[in-house]
Amino acid sequence: MSIMKKPDLSDPKLRAKLAQNMGHNYYGEPAWPNDILFTFPICIAGTIGLITGLAILDPAMIGEPGNPFATPLEILPEWYLYPVFQILRVLPNKLLGIACQGAIPLGLMMVPFIESVNKFQNPFRRPVAMAVFLFGTAVTLWLGAGACFPIDESLTLGLF
């Protein structure tokens, strides 16, 4: 018994659908059991084998090895905390820095209420939400890049 389902080309309904470029789902190789039982496990095993082989043959170091007896000149957090670190570093009062970080989620929660008149889902037709998103992205990138510079050059990114 063949797994392939042969189309009946003498059927007028099928001929009409084929004339309209339809009917490709009526014949061909089925996904079950051919793809799911044979092709997918081979792809998954190959991917796992490739990643494991690369990890064993060429172990890449993540940064330089740590030395517990030497303190670095400047301690930086992980890259995703650079903007928060920069806010705390630049603002003179630490309470003001914490208040600014608390104001960010509060401001984001206010955006739907500010733009509640606009019923469009398309982001290009929602100017307030798009402006808040673009401004927040630009400020986050600016703060993140500034965290890598010394404190006196961090706000200007060393350009001025």
Swiss-Prot record:
Subcellular location: Cellular thylakoid membrane
Location (main, coarse): membrane
Keyword Electron transport: yes
UniProt entry tagged with the keyword Membrane: yes
Coiled-coil zones: none
A Pfam family it matches: Cytochrom_B_C
Gene Ontology biological process terms in this record: photosynthetic electron transport chain
Top-level taxonomic group: Bacteria
Transmembrane segments: 36-56, 95-115, 131-151
Topological type in the membrane: Multi-pass membrane protein
Keywords linked to the UniProt accession: Electron transport, Membrane, Photosynthesis, Thylakoid, Transmembrane, Transmembrane helix, Transport
UniProt-recorded Gene Ontology molecular function terms: electron transporter, transferring electrons within cytochrome b6/f complex of photosystem II activity; electron transporter, transferring electrons within the cyclic electron transport pathway of photosynthesis activity; oxidoreductase activity
InterPro entries xrefs: Cyt_b/b6_C (IPR005798), Cyt_b/b6_C_sf (IPR036150), Cyt_b6/f_cplx_suIV (IPR005870), Cytochrome_b_C_euk/bac (IPR048260)
Cellular component annotations (GO), alphabetically ordered: plasma membrane-derived thylakoid membrane
Function: Component of the cytochrome b6-f complex, which mediates electron transfer between photosystem II (PSII) and photosystem I (PSI), cyclic electron flow around PSI, and state transitions.
Family: Belongs to the cytochrome b family. PetD subfamily.
Subunit: The 4 large subunits of the cytochrome b6-f complex are cytochrome b6, subunit IV (17 kDa polypeptide, PetD), cytochrome f and the Rieske protein, while the 4 small subunits are PetG, PetL, PetM and PetN. The complex functions as a dimer.
Name of this protein: Cytochrome b6-f complex subunit 4
Originating species: Picosynechococcus sp. (strain ATCC 27264 / PCC 7002 / PR-6)
Gene name for this UniProt entry: petD
